[in-house]
From Swiss-Prot:
This is Polyribonucleotide nucleotidyltransferase. CDD domains: KH-I_PNPase, RNase_PH_PNPase_1, RNase_PH_PNPase_2, S1_PNPase. Involved in mRNA degradation. Catalyzes the phosphorolysis of single-stranded polyribonucleotides processively in the 3'- to 5'-direction. It comes from Albidiferax ferrireducens (strain ATCC BAA-621 / DSM 15236 / T118) (Rhodoferax ferrireducens). Belongs to the polyribonucleotide nucleotidyltransferase family. The gene is pnp. One of its GO terms (cellular component) is cytosol.
Length: 706
């Protein structure tokens, strides 16, 4: 009899067969599920503490997605030969899992929860992120932890006008969309996508299609829970202190209402802090025993109620706008004198200084991914220091949020970048957020597009981004255009859309409540399009098209094509030839397998010299042509003459002079420059030369023949 109480569920999901197991591996975790999706195997575990920490007012959920190189039959390339800090993909996948599960834990549940996912085996054609989402949903569902799941998730492609469920790596090359959707049976909770300028209707259709397909996984998880689920925790939210809530409300309501009439963010924040301090002081004066953390939570609830009720009543928003108006926009290009491209994009109290740097192919990021190595010639890095929100704090390595925002902005711009053939540069865009009051990632999209155009990158179109919000109470709702930071915190949805005049290039949606309908999403998309067109108009006014020339401080790239068989000649033994070329000409030279050579130099003259020398190296020796070159070696029967770099010919002793030559050294010496004519090449490719045909015969007026 086995010591394991293993339960297995298998279901067909599109073209994939999925098997979920629990009860054999990681039995001491609160919940653990091993999921196999056609050779991609992930282990999802969840552990929750049985008690919350005293005085804690937030939900401490941590999600760690970890890839093991053995999953793809690899050994880590680092010095220590073991996995190190999380890769960007691991960080992004951790966020992808966190976003749809976080809203499903009950309000007031502050017990620490740790979700860990290990990728144990990888089929390159089956994405581990989707497998991980399903496995985490199953592990949480069987654990008994308070959780309003399960969730389903699916990747959606769009190929030849049709939606495709969970397309693999190969199929995605033909897809004009890469969309991931996650949600419960009833509602969509999270969307992450990039697209090739597609319409709102196609994008919304993909969300609906993906949500429907995710329900197949939800049904299978229900079956697993029925057979293997642990008892549901007997957890109840702490009872609310109604008398204290009423007391705080009486003391704070008017003060906070007055604070939210202030349009300036910094002044409003100060007024709210002062209101908090006054309420705490009044409670102490009244002799009320209270927990300051709990009172702060009550005050936040009052703030939320004020802001939400004002918006639903049709009153002006926090900064005085209506629901559809975009904040004032200011744009300045070429802000920094010696960078390759720069733009300062300001929208209200959100500002991004975005800088583009152009490099050679050698500057491309080499990524050692589990599914295979590749190079990325476009990078976008997002930084938001504490001063952007008027706060103090630590500055250092990028946090998960910064990595996620950078990735979203990158996705938005990728669809309109020129191909490598059109523009062979490596591009790095850095967005420095210098002010933030909502939607800084979308400011990075707008500023990034303008910065690239300022650098001379021939973009296919302008790209703008906008963040939408939602306030919903029962059947009443309001969609907000260009949300502020406070509206993001106090609202029910963060919906970011980026695109061109032709269509959407990136879409990200995070919903904090259930009950968002297709109709609400349609309204949000239509309102976002209206705002996007407005911003695109402002951007086109500021910069109608990309500069026709790259910056004088950027490297100039010159391309040429050689016979691929000649690549070894240009590189030389141990890289000696190309190393000498780069050092002597002061250029960077990159050679592709197809024989395309890219020469990079800020000085066109140096690039031309490198090109001339490469042409020399790769040139073929022509029969009948006269060459001038040094003697590289004296032999008993002749001499070797260098005709072209790396190409020597034999000058036989009989071809040195018309008279009989007894000793080669009587006529020639090493290093001597001589003129020779190529007479023939033998079957082994050896080159035969003659000097005497270029010399006058004794007693005659000219050479034999030239």
């Amino acid at each position: 009899m086995s010591i394991f109480n293993k339960v297995t569920k298998t279901f067909q999901w599109g073209q994939n067969t999925v098997t979920m197991e629990t009860g054999e591996i990681a039995r001491q975790a609160s919940g653990a599920v091993l999921l196999d999706m056609d050779g991609t195997v992930v282990l999802a575990t969840v552990v929750a503490k049985t008690e919350g920490k005293a005085g804690q007012d937030f939900f401490p959920l941590t999600v760690d997605y970890l890839e093991k190189t053995y999953a793809a039959g690899k050994i880590p390339g680092s010095f220590f030969k073991r996995e190190g800090r999380p890769s960007e993909f691991e960080t992004l996948t951790s966020r992808l899992i966190d976003r749809p599960i976080r809203p499903l834990f009950p309000e007031g549940f502050f017990n620490e929860v740790h979700v860990v996912v290990h990728t144990l085996s990888l089929n390159p054609e089956v994405d581990a992120d989707i497998a991980a989402l399903i496995a985490v949903s199953a592990a949480l569902s069987v654990s008994g932890i308070p959780f309003s799941g399960p969730i389903g998730a699916a990747r959606v492609g769009y190929i030849n006008g049709e939606y495709v469920l969970n397309p693999g790596q190969t199929a995605r090359k033909d897809s004009v969309m890469d969309l991931v959707v996650a949600g419960t049976e009833a509602a969509v909770l999270m969307v992450e996508s990039e697209a090739q300028q597609l319409s709102e209707e196609i994008m919304l259709g993909a969300v609906v299609f993906g949500h429907e397909q995710g329900n197949i996984a939800i049904n299978a998880i229900h079956e697993l829970v029925r057979d293997a689920g642990k008892p549901v925790w007997d957890w109840k939210a702490p009872a609310k202190d109604e008398p204290l809530i009423a007391k705080v409300g009486a003391l704070a309501a008017h003060k906070l209402e007055a604070a939210y009439q202030i349009r300036n963010k910094q002044a409003r924040t100060r007024a709210c802090r002062e209101a908090y301090a006054v309420v705490m002081a009044d409670l102490k004066l009244d002799g009320v025993a209270f927990d300051s953390v709990a009172v702060e939570g009550m005050l936040f609830d009052i703030e939320a109620k004020i802001v939400r009720s004002q918006i639903l009543a049709g009153e002006p928003r926090i900064d005085g706008r209506d629901t559809r108006t975009v904040r004032p926009i200011e744009i300045r290009n070429s802000v920094l004198p010696r960078t390759h491209g720069s733009a300062l994009f300001t929208r209200g109290e959100t500002q991004a200084l975005v800088v583009t740097t152009l490099g050679t192919e050698r500057d491309a990021q080499r990524i050692d991914a589990l599914s295979g190595d590749y190079e990325d010639r476009f990078m976008l890095h997002y930084n938001m220091p504490p001063f952007a929100t008027g706060e103090t704090g630590r500055v250092g390595t990028p946090k998960r949020r910064e990595i996620g925002h950078g990735r979203l902005a990158k996705r938005a711009l990728m669809a309109v970048l020129p191909s490598k053939e059109e523009f062979p540069y490596t591009m790095r865009v850095v967005s420095e957020i210098t002010e933030s009051n909502g939607s800084s990632s979308m400011a990075s999209v707008c500023g990034g597009c303008l910065s690239l155009m300022d650098a001379g990158v021939p973009m296919k179109a302008h790209v703008a981004g906008i963040a939408m919000g939602l306030i919903k109470e029962e059947n009443r709702f309001a969609v907000l255009t260009d949300i502020l930071g406070d509206e993001d915190h106090l609202g029910d949805m963060d919906f970011k859309v980026a695109g061109t005049t032709n269509g959407i290039t990136a879409l990200q949606m995070d919903i904090k409540i259930q009950g968002i309908t297709k109709e609400i999403m349609q309204v949000a998309l239509a309102q976002a399009k209206e705002a996007r067109m407005h911003i695109l108009g402002k951007m086109q006014e500021a910069m109608a098209e990309a500069k026709t020339e790259v910056s004088t401080f950027a490297p100039r790239l010159f391309t040429m094509k050689i016979n691929p068989d000649k690549i070894r000649d240009v590189i030389g033994k141990g890289g000696s030839v190309i190393r000498a070329l780069t050092e002597e000409t002061g250029t960077q030279i990159n050679i592709d397998e197809d024989g395309t050579i890219t020469i990079a130099s800020a000085d066109p003259a140096k690039a031309e010299e490198a090109k001339r020398r490469i042409q020399q190296i790769t040139a073929e020796v022509e029969i009948g042509k006269i060459y001038e070159g040094p003697i590289t070696k004296i032999l008993d029967f002749g001499a070797l003459v260098n005709l072209l770099p790396g190409k020597d010919g034999l000058l036989h002793i009989s071809q040195i002079a018309h008279e009989r030559v007894e000793k080669v050294t009587d006529y020639l010496s090493e290093g001597q420059i001589v003129k020779v004519k190529v007479m023939e090449t033998d079957e082994k490719g050896r080159i035969k030369l003659s000097m005497k045909v270029l010399l006058d015969r004794p007693g005659q007026g000219g050479p034999e023949h030239v």
